[in-house]
Amino acid sequence: MSKSLQAIRGMNDILPEQTPLWRHFEGTVARLLDNYGYRQIRMPIVEFTELFKRSIGEVTDIVEKEMYTFADRNGDSLTLRPEGTAACVRAVLEHGITGGGQVQKLWYIGPMFRHERPQKGRYRQFHQIGVEVFNLDGPDIDAELIVMTWRLWGLLGIRDAVKLELNSLGTSEARARYREALVEYLSARLDQLDEDSQRRLKTNPLRVLDTKHPETQAVLVDAPKLADYLDDESRVHFEGLKARLDAAGIPYVINPKLVRGLDYYSKTVFEWVTDQLGAQGTVCAGGRYDGLVEQMGGKPTAGVGFAMGIERLVLLLETLEQVPEEIARQVDVYLCAFGEAAELAALALTEKVRDQLPTLRLQVNAGAGSFKSQFKKADKSGALYALILGEEELAAKVIGVKPLRGQGEQQNIAWDALSEHLASCVVQG
């Protein structure tokens, strides 16, 4: 096939065999967020480039290397969103929904775009679910976000495979003092740093802490610690968060090198990580960004949020074999009809069943075919039961119900009793 007719490298099709697990995951998250009082917001996938330069930071890897940026026909510089927080802040500012101190607890879902090197768990188009809260500045809301994700891991059956890492970045003033001390320490050891860290030292020194280079990591062992430069306000906030996590029974580790890759974070930052996915171990991350709204032209507004990568979490569910059987099975009942009269009767009968059992996944054979071919398709569909309607069943106004996944003989069920029978053996288990 011509390359121009293939998916772009790092941007993948999600095929019908994969979507049931995606829908299961997305539905589980959506129900949880609804239960906690969060409301969905939907933003465009394209924004003015300046939005991300102002919010993420011009000297970050995302802005410098990874954004998909282009000029439209009006000459405006536009960018496919690389993350969701900046777009969400822009939306709440544009529509004034945080004015007057209104608390907003929002969530969104959709694709993000970064021109990174594709590998397992990292793609150029990837999907995130993000949560943002505005006008709440206490550690209680930070804790709620983490407690909520902890509950999600329990619902998905993956708690034992993830670990919570925490840090506090302090206020911008505290970070400035720390940055000065870190630069002084690293500048004296410049020849021991890898090339990328030398560049970051000039543009974004805190990102050196995030290095994966062994020699630079060795240099950082004796580097100044951010915790020693925290302001009192941030220290009290962080202690309040830890106390709440302890009360909720959520285990965590303090990672003093956790700084996140975006300039807008302050105070709390956190990541949920796993060792089950190789190098791409972060499955959910977030933190507080109290200065971002003001930085983007609004009034001082507290903000905190997180984003989780759907691809990585779906991959983790598959790796841990936490895919519910009913998710893997896309069809409950498959109906085989033989002859035009049976097909017409089947149409009326199945629609009546759907009226009475709206959650039943009932597939009707299309394209006619012999008994053998239809039954083969019924078996291949993964259905629990095949319904059989031929001339004899039509004359007697019954339908054959044959188990496909277990013991038991075929039964003939009267049409009027079909819904009740399927409810007892399929819907109610």
From Swiss-Prot:
One of its GO terms (biological process) is histidyl-tRNA aminoacylation. InterPro entries: aa-tRNA-synth_II, aa-tRNA-synth_II/BPL/LPL, Anticodon-bd, Anticodon-bd_dom_sf, His-tRNA-ligase, HisRS-like_core, HisRS/HisZ. The keyword Methyltransferase does not apply. PROSITE patterns: AA_TRNA_LIGASE_II. It is found in: Cytoplasm. It catalyses: tRNA(His) + L-histidine + ATP = L-histidyl-tRNA(His) + AMP + diphosphate + H(+). The keyword Metal-binding does not apply. It comes from the Bacteria. SUPFAM superfamilies: Class II aaRS ABD-related (SSF52954), Class II aaRS and biotin synthetases (SSF55681). It is an enzyme of class 6 (ligase). Its EC number is 6.1.1.21. Keywords: Aminoacyl-tRNA synthetase, ATP-binding, Cytoplasm, Ligase, Nucleotide-binding, Protein biosynthesis. GO terms for cellular component: cytoplasm. One of its GO terms (molecular function) is ATP binding. CDD domains: HisRS-like_core. PANTHER family: HISTIDINE--TRNA LIGASE, MITOCHONDRIAL-RELATED (PTHR43707:SF1), HISTIDYL-TRNA SYNTHETASE (PTHR43707). Homodimer. Belongs to the class-II aminoacyl-tRNA synthetase family. This is Histidine--tRNA ligase.
